[in-house]
């Protein structure tokens, strides 16, 4: 309905105008978050080898496709349906529009607007895992995981945090999803990569890590720029209202990302003798992930400090998983989303006067516990049934040919 229709229906003109502005802003935010799929696709494709590019693109596409369908049918009801003991939603399955009030609103917005905004968030959490399991995962196995996270992993912890569940009642604060979106995806990435095992050639006989360079830093850089741009929709859009604090949220988001980028650049320059390109790009994302939980409540200088911490932490985290834990993560998603999502959520309790460190720690650790257990169950079942990993021949030849019968660069010959 337009403004005149709302007024004719008895709504105050000011309230009607505010509602329409909120609708427009939330839809803008949702479209920006949707376009993050393109950013993730470019990052993952650029940081991996050319022979697997088509597979990367297909996985990112299917994360959104499956997320849209399964979150609509099951996930939204679990996340935002009528609360049952603070643990899970129990109403709205198969038709989430039944959760709307008599005016068709849910949480102050038309139900469709609220639903699409959380749908794109669900797809974002799912797609984080793609890069960590890249270059050796069966396509069917990945589709099964993507459906699982959209149905009963992301929505359950999402209910705890955003759906009126026990963490929300306790006062846990995760404004735009450092925990609910990014850490959930990062934990799933950790479990998936661990069970899957490293790529062929990643470690020598002595267990020393070898670099497997991505094929296109230009594409990876484009992905980072897209993600940084879309993150303004991710964080600012989480107000689901055209409010005056949008500028503050945008500023803390940008400052944290900038500080993290600079911190990563300096650390890699010191440790490696030269500023590392791919690690610096991941530093940008680390800062964005870390600030997402508290972008609405911390000061500008606190945002800079959070960014600096994330930018430094991501370097050592990537090195730890690569060299100590021996978990092969081609794009660094475990560190960027899992570790920095965890850290950013904790730091809300340090830098925000409104929220306590104790509550933030409880919220983060409880989410880790649930997601870790469910991810282990899901990936183990998939591995024991259809199998997680492709054959040695398929991995060496590339997944594009064996999984999809095509090549992303059919007319080009690559030479290093």
Annotate the PLM regions.
Residues 2-416:
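Hydrophobic alpha-helical transmembrane bundles of multi-pass membrane proteins
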């Amino acid at each position: 309905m337009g403004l005149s229709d709302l007024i004719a229906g008895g709504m105050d003109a000011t309230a009607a105008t505010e509602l329409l502005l909120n609708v427009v802003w939330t839809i803008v935010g949702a479209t920006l978050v949707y376009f993050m799929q393109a950013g993730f696709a470019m990052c993952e494709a650029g940081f991996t080898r050319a022979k697997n590019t088509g597979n990367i693109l297909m996985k990112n596409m299917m994360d959104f496709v499956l997320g849209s369908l399964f979150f609509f049918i099951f996930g939204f009801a679990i996340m935002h349906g009528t609360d049952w003991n603070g643990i899970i939603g129990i109403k709205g399955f198969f038709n989430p529009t039944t959760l709307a009030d008599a005016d068709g609103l849910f949480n102050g917005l038309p139900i469709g607007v609220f639903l699409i905004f959380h749908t794109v968030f669900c797809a974002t959490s799912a797609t984080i895992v793609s890069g960590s399991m890249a270059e050796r995962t069966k396509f069917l196995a990945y589709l099964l995981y993507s459906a699982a996270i959209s149905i009963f992993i992301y929505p359950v912890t999402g209910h705890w945090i955003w759906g009126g569940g026990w963490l929300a009642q306790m006062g846990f604060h995760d404004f735009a999803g450092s925990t609910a979106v990014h850490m959930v995806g990062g934990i799933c990435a950790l479990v998936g990569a661990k069970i899957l095992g490293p790529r062929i050639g990643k470690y020598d006989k002595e267990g020393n890590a070898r670099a497997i360079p991505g094929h296109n830093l230009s594409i990876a850089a484009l992905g980072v720029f897209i993600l940084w741009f879309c993150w303004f929709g991710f964080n600012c859009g989480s107000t689901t209202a055209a409010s005056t604090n949008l500028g503050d949220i945008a500023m803390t988001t940008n400052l944290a990302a900038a500080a993290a980028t600079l911190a990563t650049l300096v650390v890699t320059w010191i440790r490696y003798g030269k500023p590392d390109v791919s690690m610096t790009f991941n530093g940008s994302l680390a800062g964005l992930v870390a600030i997402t939980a508290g972008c609405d409540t911390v000061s500008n200088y606190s945002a800079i400090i959070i960014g600096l911490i994330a930018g430094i932490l991501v370097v050592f985290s990537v090195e730890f998983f690569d060299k100590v834990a021996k978990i092969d993560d081609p794009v660094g998603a475990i560190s960027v989303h899992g570790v920095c999502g965890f850290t950013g959520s904790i730091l809300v309790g340090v830098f925000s006067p409104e929220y306590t460190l104790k509550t933030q720690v409880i919220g983060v650790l409880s989410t880790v516990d649930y997601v870790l257990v469910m991810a282990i169950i899901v990936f183990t079942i998939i591995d024991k049934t259809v199998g997680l990993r492709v054959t040695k021949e398929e991995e060496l030849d590339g997944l594009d040919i064996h999984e999809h019968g095509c090549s992303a660069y059919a007319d080009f010959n690559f030479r290093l």
